[in-house]
Curated annotation (Swiss-Prot):
It comes from Citrobacter koseri (strain ATCC BAA-895 / CDC 4225-83 / SGSC4696). It is found in: Cytoplasm. Its EC number is 6.1.1.11. InterPro entries: aa-tRNA-synt_IIb (IPR002314), aa-tRNA-synth_II (IPR006195), aa-tRNA-synth_II/BPL/LPL (IPR045864), Ser-tRNA-ligase_type_1 (IPR002317), Ser-tRNA-synth_1_N (IPR015866), SerRS_1_N_sf (IPR042103), SerRS_core (IPR033729), tRNA-bd_arm (IPR010978). The lineage of its organism: Bacteria, Pseudomonadati, Pseudomonadota, Gammaproteobacteria, Enterobacterales. The gene is serS. GO terms for molecular function: ATP binding; serine-tRNA ligase activity. This is Serine--tRNA ligase. It catalyses: tRNA(Ser) + L-serine + ATP = L-seryl-tRNA(Ser) + AMP + diphosphate + H(+); tRNA(Sec) + L-serine + ATP = L-seryl-tRNA(Sec) + AMP + diphosphate + H(+).
Length: 430
């Protein structure tokens, strides 16, 4: 959520920056609402002052032995007018807030301006894609060869865009998540967390999924009206519960940065992706991810973004997977991000790079929604923290990359050296 003072005082500057994202801010409407708010605010304050004054007059008139009934009726009428004015003001403030909740974050000044993914800018590459001297199999074919990926069983159990993993493929999937967690906790300074996979609406508002992206979530509801009326949603990413751990908190600045990680399943409806990536593990309704979240001082957030992206890169480097680093243009960034790096891993069967990690600096956009603040020891003043989140990595897509990049001519899959300790020394699947 943007700073309301910025929206009130510099709407044209805000509109210009949002236009870089392809978002049109209705400045005239905001100005009209703000002018109306000022009028209602003054009217409410005047009515309150008048009512207070008349209420005091009742006591004074009573002390003089005068008839107070006319004054009492006047105070009652003022009270009714005040209640109506407050209700109108609150309704208008709610309308302004609802609009503010739909406005994306401002892009950082160094983010390239563009319309969509075609305007993203490549920053660097690591590793060289392997040259195969045999026909490359995709991960679905490899998974079926080793009886490790069963999409038909998942359709029977649930539906499309789900999978049942079995045997050594399932074991490698688990090994990848353990390897990532160990790397981030033992070498990168993150604390491991286990979080709920169901969250309430306040939590989803805090990180920006609601109200704008309700259609992207899987929501729960009671089977009967008389049942528990709690309304939860499955998490689309561990960013949601991890970041909300600091909601409504005031943190000593000396305790920053806070670096958290968690391995969770993620659930997404994939609304709008009909017909895309229908084969395999690339785009699923349920997938595992190891998430990184940092809570930092405002002046340190851009450095933290570089650090966090490096942590995700380290996973790929230790696995020996070629990748490229992309800075997203203004039109391709997520709703809450001010700057985002994507890491794209080489997928041999597709002969292209595919996203495997996205690391974003959100500035104070989420912190303002969550009222997450830090306090300075020197002057005891509080200010909003900055939050960052990143994939470290998407486990299913990493499995795809390992299976395809490490495949052998006979269909076996070599186990990367860093994963062998998690697989009892196994060198090959198959």
């Amino acid at each position: 959520m943007l700073d309301p003072n910025l929206l009130r005082n510099e709407p044209d500057a805000v509109a210009e920056k949002l236009a870089r994202r392809g978002f049109k801010l209705d400045v005239d409407k905001l100005r009209a609402l703000e002018e109306r708010r000022k009028v209602l605010q003054v009217n409410t304050e005047n009515l309150q002052a008048e009512r207070n004054s008349r209420s005091k007059s009742i006591g004074q008139a009573k002390a003089r032995g005068e008839d107070i009934e006319p004054l009492r009726l006047e105070v009652n009428k003022l009270g009714e007018e005040l209640d109506a004015a407050k209700a109108e003001l609150e309704s208008l403030q709610a309308e302004i807030r609802d609009i503010a909740l739909t406005i994306p974050n401002l892009p950082a000044d160094d983010v390239p301006v563009g319309k969509d993914e075609n305007d993203n800018v490549e920053v660097s590459r690591w590793g060289t894609p392997r040259e195969f001297d045999f026909d490359v199999r995709d991960h679905v074919t490899l998974g079926e060869m080793h009886a490790g990926l069963d999409f038909a069983a998942a359709v029977k159990l649930t539906g499309s865009r789900f999978v049942v993993m079995k045997g050594q493929i399932a074991r490698m999937h688990r090994a990848l998540s353990q390897f990532m967690l160990d790397l981030h906790t033992e070498q990168h300074g993150y604390s491991e967390n286990y979080v709920p996979y169901l969250v309430n609406h306040d939590t989803l508002y805090g990180t920006g999924q609601l109200p704008k992206f309700a259609g992207d979530l899987f929501h729960t509801r009671p089977l009967e009206e008389e049942a528990d009326s709690s309304n939860y949603a499955l998490i689309p990413t561990a960013e949601v519960p991890l970041t909300n751990l600091v909601r409504d908190e005031i943190i000593d600045e000396d305790a920053l940065p806070i670096k958290m990680t968690a391995h969770t399943p993620c659930f997404r409806s994939e609304a709008g992706s009909y017909g895309r990536d229908t084969r395999g593990l690339i785009r699923m309704h349920q997938f595992d991810k190891v998430e990184m979240v940092q809570i930092v001082r405002p002046e340190e957030s851009m450095d933290a973004l570089e650090e966090m992206t490096g942590h995700a890169e380290k996973v790929l480097q230790l696995l020996g997977l070629p990748y490229r680093k992309i800075v997203l243009c203004t039109g391709d960034m997520g709703f809450g991000a001010c700057k985002t790096y994507d890491l794209e891993v080489w997928i041999p069967a597709q002969n292209t790079y595919r996203e495997i990690s996205s690391c974003s600096n959100v500035w104070d956009f989420q912190a303002r929604r969550m009222q997450a603040r830090c306090r300075s020891k020197s002057d005891k003043k509080t200010r909003l923290v900055h939050t960052l989140n990143g994939s470290g990595l998407a486990v299913g897509r990493t499995l795809v990359a390992v299976m395809e990049n490490y495949q052998q001519a006979d269909g076996r899959i070599e186990v990367p050296e860093v994963l062998r300790p998690y697989m009892n020394g196994l060198e090959y699947i198959g």
